[in-house]
Structures are given as C-alpha cells and as structure tokens.
Amino acid sequence: VLSAADKANVKAAWGKVGGQAGAHGAEALERMFLGFPTTKTYFPHFNLSHGSDQVKAHGQKVADALTKAVGHLDDLPGALSALSDLHAHKLRVDPVNFKLLSHCLLVTLAAHHPDDFNPSVHASLDKFLANVSTVLTSKYR
C-alpha cells in the first residue's frame, strides 16, 4: 500500500518525466532486451534494434499506462483492468517480466533524473511499480 508520502513522491517524480515519458519507456525496454534477452521472445515481430520505431511505440504505450496509473493511485486495479486482461489472457506474458521492466524503468529514471532520485523517491517508485506489476498479474490465477 502506498502511503501519502509515497503517492506524493510518485506524482512529483512522474511529473518531472513530463514529455520524455515515451522516450524513457523505450529506453527501459531497450535496457530490458539487452540485460534480459529472454524478454525478446514476446516481441518476435518487432525490430528490436536501438531506436526502432516499434520499440519507441511500445515505450509510449508503457509510459501511457504508467501515466494512467499515476493518475489513479487509489484505484490501480480499476485503472489497469483492461491491460491486465490483455497481458494475462491474450499476450500471456510471464509475470517475472514486469519485475524486470520495473527494474529497467528505475535505472532509466535514475540515469535521467539523478538530482531527484533520492532514496525516498526510489523506494516510492519501487513500491508503485511493484503495485502496478501485482495488478497486471492479478488475472493470471
């Protein structure tokens, strides 16, 4: 459960991402594909090379979903229900991949916003991404 301080940290941190959210999402995906090559199996039809339009487009989808989640911190299950259905029933993504992408998102955010990425913000973002991952995998059971 996110505390009031966590919610404030998440909103402030994501607000600073601003118009770079899609680029950060794409960079996090690239980091995931490089660091955890087995994750590429879910994207056999994508050009996974650096800067590809398909990775950029999916990075924007990731960013849009996180932006929606940040706007609905008190109802993540409601806000992400359709996305949870998609990943569980149609795409059948291994739940561990959400944790891997979350890690890569944290690294990307820390790299681009080092002055704002203090231990408190790091912990809040980690909790937020863990909650998002839990919601996205909730319909697997």
UniProtKB/Swiss-Prot annotation:
Modification type N6-acetyllysine: residues: 16
Annotated Pfam families: Globin
InterPro entries the UniProt entry points to: Globin, Globin-like_sf, Globin/Proto, Hemoglobin_a-typ, Hemoglobin_oxygen_transport, Hemoglobin_pi
Binding site for O2: 58
A cellular component term, taken from the record's GO annotations: haptoglobin-hemoglobin complex
In-chain residues carrying the UniProt-annotated modification Phosphoserine: 3, 49, 102, 124, 138
Superkingdom per UniProt: Eukaryota
Keywords in alphabetical order: Acetylation, Heme, Iron, Metal-binding, Oxygen transport, Phosphoprotein, Transport
Binding site for heme b: 87
Domain Globin as annotated: residue spans: 1-141
One example of a Gene Ontology biological process annotation: cellular oxidant detoxification
Modified residues (N6-succinyllysine): 7, 11, 16, 40
Any GO molecular function: heme binding
Chain positions found as Phosphothreonine: 108, 134, 137
Tissue-specificity statement: Red blood cells.
Role of this protein: Involved in oxygen transport from the lung to the various peripheral tissues.
Self-association state and partner proteins as the record states: Heterotetramer of two alpha chains and two beta chains.
Family (UniProt): Belongs to the globin family.
Protein name, UniProt field: Hemoglobin subunit alpha
Species assigned in the record: Sus scrofa (Pig)
